[in-house]
Amino acid sequence: RYNIELGGENVTQAELDAAAEVTHVRPLVDRLEAGYSHPVSERGVNFSTGERQLLSFARALVRKPDILLLDEATSSVDTETEALVQDALHHLMAGKTSIVVAHRLSTIKDVDRIYVMHQGEICERGRHEELLAQRGLYWRLYQLQYAHQEGRSVA
């Protein structure tokens, strides 16, 4: 419990449970012998990378920040966990100003504005659909990441 409410003020059990549900932490908590009271090793080494990521999202959700800064939120997770992380991010970022650094474009395709950086400079900006239509660097990166999934060029 302490690990999720860390830094949150007066977090109720209902808020804790709601955060665990929308960030997909509930199955993890249910598997743990002591549930929310399960001891967490230093740096969370007793959890997988994906589990640590989802726990950090639950923690952020109960703190109710106005601004989120996310750096490679889906890095180092398997495909199944990435889907859970993406869904959790959707809930976490709703109604908040979010600055997201990402190489996996699936993490940012639904945001209001994307800034594409190349060699330290912003070279493109726009929404996902706009950037695909421009057929620039973002489009090329998207092709590299997703064309193989459909067996053809995307967009």
Where are these regions (language model features)?
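C-terminal boundary and immediately downstream tail of ABC-type ATPase nucleotide-binding domains
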Residues: 133-155
